[in-house]
Amino acid sequence: MSKYVITKTLNNNVIICTKNHQEVVLIGKGIGFNKKVGMTVQENASIEKIYKLEQQEQQEHYKTLLELGEDHVVQAVIESVNIINESGLITDDKNLVVALTDHIIYAYKRLKQHQMITNPFVIETKHLYSNAYNVARKVIDKLNKTLDVHFPEDEIGFIALHIASNSEKLSIHDISVINKLINKSITIIETDLQHSIDKQTIQYQRFIRHIQFLIYRLTKGEYLEAQENFISMIKTMYPRSFNTAYKILKMIQREFSVYVYEAEIVYLTLHINHFEVQISSE
């Protein structure tokens, strides 16, 4: 049976070991209790997680985080990663475990100090990444119970972003950019229509999903096609919505410094017109 040589004990639940000249992080309840440097650990059921972080910088950062966290917080992180793994949304949790450990440890410290950070994109995250959001809710429910705290819904959104960035192969930055552009688009619509948009409607969900895929197409160099006469017809039928759609596309074009094809304005106009009809019927 394989053995690991202990090089450092971080706490009762986490130890740093080497095996075949490879440094690994072993996590398991009570795995570090009464353990000292130089002792060996067999690979058995007491080891809940084995992390082989490839990059030295990543290794050092993760070890520093684990030293900062209290035993029960580190255990809560382990349980959180298990919940996410069991969801089937991700295939490789190496990057996620570092990001999640970092986030949960500091979120817990902020909560204890009554210094919570507001998440302006909770609704957008909930609609765009519903599967990740549902799993994140389970994570937060578990953290609340395990740590005897009450994280606000903002934290569900933050955890969901970490899950989504791993499951959809997008960086947190990419997702943040998409959310910001959605917010800017909604601001343009609300300004032109002089009315707030209800973010709990199916129409809103469809709109933000459309913006998301529009941005995907731009980043991949893909584009929609539409006949010129169809574009002219939409412009004549829905002039106000068309004008608003034009503003949004110009804004996106500036943000990405890429050309946005005219065909995009057709489908965007139709989405905006749905908002206009919805508002006029109130």
Swiss-Prot record:
- A single GO molecular function term of this UniProt record: RNA binding
Q: Which GO terms describe its biological process?
A: positive regulation of DNA-templated transcription
From the record, give the cysteines joined by S-S bonds.
none
Which of UniProt's keywords are assigned here?
Repeat
Keyword Protein biosynthesis in annotation: no
Pfam families for this protein: CAT_RBD, PRD
Which InterPro entries does the entry link to? BglG_antiterminators (IPR050661), CAT_RNA-bd_dom (IPR004341), CAT_RNA-bd_dom_sf (IPR036650), PRD (IPR011608), PRD_sf (IPR036634), Transcrpt_antitermin_CS (IPR001550)
- Outline the extent of the PRD domain: 68-173, 174-282
Give the family, as the similarity comment puts it: Belongs to the transcriptional antiterminator BglG family. GlcT subfamily.
Name listed for the protein in its UniProt record: Protein GlcT
